[in-house]
């Protein structure tokens, strides 16, 4: 059901939007009261709002009661910290920059097989076979299995992506793993270990994020790469907290608007309860909405407005006039593989050309799959994977 009562996911206060669409009546009165209660709760100090929060839950339950319970309200806590966040030394910053360069080199040079990579390469060949190169085709025609070529075979399910064991970088990790076991130490590699490998500056991400856990051990700052590593676009992991820092917001906006016209994909996910998680803010000029209303209908690109062509060795999304190069993005951390095939293909083809489809598979992941014990893995002085045992029960 598509209704203007269903609020946009981006750049909108959902409750304010809903109130603006409702006429005066019992529901509107109840929601206005609820809005005031939430605002009063937000003004309280941490620890003072328990009773009011329970009243809010009761009010929401009186409006609509979940049959099997559920969370009626998400509560975000913001801690004001007056200390110094500048705890990273210049040496640590330089190490992070070298780590970022290392990831770019791995994305460019590691040889992979199977999974998304092979499937999208086959999709390229099918497209060229039917339409040729340098020819812009309506996207809705391409994905029509009768008139076009449908969707990649990988979307039907299949083998996952793997790294070729003959890959030189994989072999280097294998050698360092064996040395670590013999010496009883950890696996450590350096920028110089990848000096023979180049990066393709014309075909790399405009920006990406790295996620770290920071610990102070014996007065020294120690960096641990986060379990999810990061994301393929600056700001994606910020979600609904994106607007808390205007300085950070402007920096991210400048990074992401260098080479393409970014189009934010705003959608209600298949798992409706995840809509709270992906509610976010976006500075993109254009948007394409799925299963919900647009926050900016004047700058919305419908599926019928999107064209696709293959040229210069890769796919390009454009508008009908071919002037704007489009890149479809999601300013959230939801895995697009779990969503509709149309949305998934827009993201995959936008990101595949920039190596992002390889973001979650690295040589140390292969080691962890095949070995009983993996020592701590360091890139220079940064821990990218802690020691682990693989136990079968």
Residue ranges and their predicted role:
Residues 224-393:
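C-terminal structured domains
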Residues 2-284, 302-304, 315-320:
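Type-3 copper protein
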């Amino acid at each position: 059901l598509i209704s203007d009562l269903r609020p946009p996911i981006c750049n909108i206060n959902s409750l304010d939007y809903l109130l603006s669409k409702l006429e005066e009546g019992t529901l509107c009165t109840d929601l206005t009261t609820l809005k005031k209660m939430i605002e009063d709760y937000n003004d309280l100090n941490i620890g003072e709002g328990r009773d009011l929060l329970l009243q809010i839950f009761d009010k929401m339950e009186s409006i609509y009661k979940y049959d099997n319970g559920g969370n009626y309200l998400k509560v975000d806590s913001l801690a004001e910290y007056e200390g110094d966040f500048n705890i990273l030394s210049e040496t640590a910053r330089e190490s992070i920059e070298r780590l970022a360069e290392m990831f770019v080199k791995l994305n460019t040079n590691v040889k992979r097989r199977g999974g998304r990579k092979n499937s999208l390469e086959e999709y390229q060949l099918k497209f060229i076979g039917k339409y040729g190169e340098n020819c812009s085709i309506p996207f809705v025609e391409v994905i029509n299995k009768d008139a076009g070529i449908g969707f990649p075979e990988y979307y039907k399910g299949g083998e996952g992506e793997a790294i070729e064991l003959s890959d030189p970088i994989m072999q280097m990790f294998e050698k360092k793993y064996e040395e670590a076991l013999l010496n009883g130490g950890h696996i450590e590699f350096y920028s110089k270990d990848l000096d023979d490998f180049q990066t393709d500056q014309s075909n790399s991400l405009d920006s990406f994020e790295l996620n770290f856990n920071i610990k102070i051990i014996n007065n020294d700052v120690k960096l641990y790469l986060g379990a999810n590593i990061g994301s393929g676009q600056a700001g994606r992991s910020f979600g609904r907290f994106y607007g808390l820092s205007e300085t950070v917001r402007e920096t991210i906006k400048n990074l992401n608007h260098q080479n393409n016209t970014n189009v934010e994909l705003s959608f209600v996910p298949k798992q409706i309860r995840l809509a709270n998680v992906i509610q976010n803010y976006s500075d993109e000029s254009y948007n394409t909405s799925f299963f919900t209303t647009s926050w900016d209908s004047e700058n919305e690109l419908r599926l019928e407005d999107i064209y696709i062509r293959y040229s210069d060795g890769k796919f390009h999304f454009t508008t009908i006039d071919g002037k704007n190069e489009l890149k479809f993005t999601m300013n959230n951390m939801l895995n697009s593989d779990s969503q509709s095939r149309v949305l998934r293909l827009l993201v995959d083809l936008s990101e595949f050309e920039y190596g992002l489809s390889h973001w979650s598979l690295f040589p140390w992941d292969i080691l962890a799959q095949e070995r009983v014990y993996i020592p701590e893995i360091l890139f220079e002085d940064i821990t990218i994977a802690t020691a682990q045992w693989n136990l079968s029960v």
